[in-house]
Regions:
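Canonical P-loop GTPase G-domain recognition
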Residues: 1-41
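C-terminal effector/interaction modules appended to NTPase cores
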Residues: 44-207
Length: 207
């Protein structure tokens, strides 16, 4: 690529140089396993004591024999079998599949936890997080007020700790505001009532 003489003020990369620097985004199947737990179901008819963990794979893949960790609890187990309803059992589940599996150890897990492979990158677990939000509520978003924070299948009460900045959507300028009005974008700090597992937007782990 040849730099134009008409833009002597520009010292950044050319379009071709920038395109060559792009890194392909892994397909959801090739990212670390993320399966938010939708529910745990127990079947007792005919002496069937299996507990089936159900959910949808947001990313990654899952096979019988895989060692998994549930976050935020940190509980570990091994996948004993894959389970599907009224269909042949697949060799593996991949991102996008509605999945069910049984465990070798009957540990207690609940809706909202995230199943991950022990050998792969773990999600973040925390009670305080920085987030960019697009506010759609009728009432302004105000510090000190309590809200529900939803991530995957988890639903946790949270308090808005502070507003770092409000962004003017038309000019992209930062505004100093004490509250966030409807249809405004803001960067805020949230404090959750209990530890919750999540991935950051730039981690490459989300589905």
């Amino acid at each position: 690529a040849i730099r134009s003489e008409r833009t002597p003020w520009y010292f950044g990369p050319t379009v071709l140089e920038q395109m060559d620097a792009f890194v392909p985004v892994p397909s959801p199947e090739n990212r670390p396993l993320r399966m938010p737990v939708q529910g745990v179901y127990k079947f007792t008819e005919g002496g069937d004591e299996r507990r089936i963990v159900a959910g949808t794979l947001e990313a990654g893949s899952l096979r019988a024999g895989d060692k998994i960790v549930f976050y935020p609890s940190g509980k570990k187990t091994t996948v004993a079998s894959l389970e599907v309803f009224s269909a042949p059992t697949p060799e593996k589940f991949i991102a996008g599949d509605a999945a069910g599996f049984t465990m070798t150890e009957q540990i207690f897990v609940r809706r909202g936890e995230i199943a991950c492979l022990e050998s792969e990158e773990a999600p973040f677990v925390g009670v305080r997080l920085r987030a960019n939000v697009f506010w759609l509520g009728k009432e302004p978003l105000r510090p000190g007020k309590r809200y529900f924070f939803k991530c995957g299948t988890a639903k946790v009460e949270a308090r808005l700790e502070s507003i770092l900045r409000v962004v003017d959507a038309s000019e992209l300028d930062s505004l100093e505001r004490s509250e966030v009005q409807k249809n405004e974008v803001a960067e805020v700090i949230l404090r959750l009532d209990r530890p919750t597992a999540f991935d950051t937007a730039d981690s490459g782990c989300d589905g």
